[in-house]
A protein has these predicted regions:
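Surface-exposed loop/turn motifs in large extracellular/passenger domains
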Residues: 1-201
Length: 201
């Protein structure tokens, strides 16, 4: 489910943008699908993914990202799988995290679930496009497990020079991080959370 491309496998994705609203509901047993502002699922195999911009509000039940809900790369060591991508849309889980399925898991400003991937010079300021401001009555938006400003969950993935910018929001309930919700056999290089960025749990 996506604003521009539902599934892309081994094709270059360059200079695309999305706006408006993207909402989706997926089966909860398969990680290799997602809901994204640009793409639901991206697999690069060395193809270029760069200069993508999302301003759409994206909401889904799992693997939700401003650029891609699910992203699988090839070039982990170099930072070239995904580069120079930006999100300014509000990214939310539509459901609370479930202990017996993947519902409510993997929500990220750029990528919800990253597998064997490298991201470089990606930036997120979630909610800025619509002028969103968090209020106490918005506590029902605090849903999701593994929620990150850039990546919700990274498996064997690396981030280089990525930033969560000021005046953006990362809204979740468990394992919420300004840059990454959680990493498994992964790494960050010079990740930056701006001083005025807001993480709410």
């Amino acid at each position: 489910v996506a604003g521009v491309i539902e599934v892309s496998d081994s094709k270059s994705v360059i200079k695309l943008s999305a706006s408006g609203t993207v909402t989706g509901t997926l089966p909860t047993g398969d990680t290799a699908r997602g809901i994204g502002g640009i793409a639901g699922s991206l697999t690069t195999n060395g193809a270029a993914v760069k200069t993508l911009t999302n301003s759409a509000a994206v909401t889904g039940n799992r693997s939700v990202g401003g650029i891609a809900g699910y992203f699988s790369g090839k070039d982990q060591a170099t930072g070239k799988d995904m580069s120079d991508c930006k999100n300014e849309g509000l990214i939310l889980s539509s459901t609370a995290a479930d202990d017996h399925s993947l519902a409510g898991h993997y929500i990220g400003g750029i990528v919800g679930y990253a597998h064997n991937a490298s991201l470089s010079e990606c930036r997120s300021r979630a909610g800025y496009a619509d002028g969103y401001t968090y209020k106490q009555e918005d506590r029902d938006k605090l849903r999701g497990r593994y929620v990150g400003g850039i990546v919700g969950y990274g498996e064997q993935s690396v981030l280089y020079d990525c930033e969560t910018e000021a005046n953006g929001y990362v809204l979740g309930s468990e394992y919420v991080g300004g840059i990454i919700g959680a990493l498994n056999q992964s790494d960050t290089q010079t990740a930056l959370l701006s001083e005025n960025g807001t993480r709410t749990t």
